[in-house]
Amino acid sequence: MEDIKNLINGWLLNKSNYLAGKGEINLSKIVSKGLIDRTIEERQNDIKKEIYKEIDSQILKIDLESQTSSRIVVLVELNYLERILKNSGEFVNETSLNPLKVKYILGFSNKSWKLVDFVSGL
């Protein structure tokens, strides 16, 4: 379960940095192309709106929902805080969810586990 927690933490940290405009998204080893594309699209929409997001999240709890040889589903509770700011730094909005419940789906391919999808706000 610690490996799954590390993988999800890696995703959350990299996604957060990317949506804040800090660097590129570099997750192809642990996240499916579909999720990476979704995140890039979200950032491109933010750029058009001249905003960025600062996201702080912390895993509180992970429960295994189901597991097969090629798929793992976990339910995760997060402390989640998202701030939306204009490129000038001006505050726009803030969302705080404690906890935010998210279902993460991991798939096994090319000899490793990857995050393939998630559903938040359960």
Model-predicted segments: where are they?
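Core segments of small alpha/beta cavity-forming domains
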Residues: 1-55
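Short, solvent-exposed beta-strand/turn "edge" segments of beta-rich domains on protein surfaces
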Residues: 2, 51, 66-68, 93
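Amphipathic alpha-helical interaction segments
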Residues: 19-20, 60, 121
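Amphipathic hydrophobic-ligand
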Residues: 54-57, 96-98
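Short amphipathic beta-strand and strand-loop transition segments with alternating hydrophobic
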Residues: 58-67
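Exposed beta-sheet edge and beta->alpha loop/turn motif
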Residues: 70-122
